[in-house]
Amino acid sequence: MEPLNASLLRTLEGFESIFRDNYTPLFRYVNSIINDEDLAKDVLSDLFLNLWQQKDKLQINELKPYLFRSAKNGALKALSSRYQTSELPDDAFNIAENTYNPFEKFVAKQSIKIVEDLINSLPLHRKEMIELRLLGLKNAEIAQVLDITEKKVEYNMREAIEQLSHAIHNSNLDKATIAGGLMLINIIFTVI
């Protein structure tokens, strides 16, 4: 089988294209695992160096899941059995500055903070799936990155939606914040 993007991997320009297209989401993902920007950069340097050095030997069927799986393995290796929780990427839920009036912006930021806190309270595997979804991966790609079945991803996403929705509904928050939080959850699981 001919490796996917084999022609891209054979030229420096193609490799640069792969690097440019994937570095930022990979950096966010690795940094969310290890919570250390310098170490995340080192992990990605090693990943791309290895990709370039092994370009003639690799048999990659789908590039994006391969890169995320390699990044995850590199991050876990860099942690060397040290467990550390992390926050979602700072820009996971960007709020455009000119989109909202001050009250709407306040409610949106409050809703985002609540949803982030709720996501961080999920079991680690569900949190990781949501982070990958926020980085733009589809269920099939998430399954490949985490080396699980797509059905397991779908099940855990449904369970995460139920957990998050239940937690928001049972909170002592005002209706606007609840509505904003539920809307964000819906966006995470449908649009992205």
Regions found by a protein language model. Give the residues of each.
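Structural recognition of an alpha-helix C-terminal capping motif at a helix-to-coil junction
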Residues: 28, 42-49, 53, 61-73
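N-terminal module of bacterial RNA polymerase sigma factors
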Residues: 1-25, 190-192
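Helix-turn-helix DNA-binding module
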Residues: 120, 124, 135-155
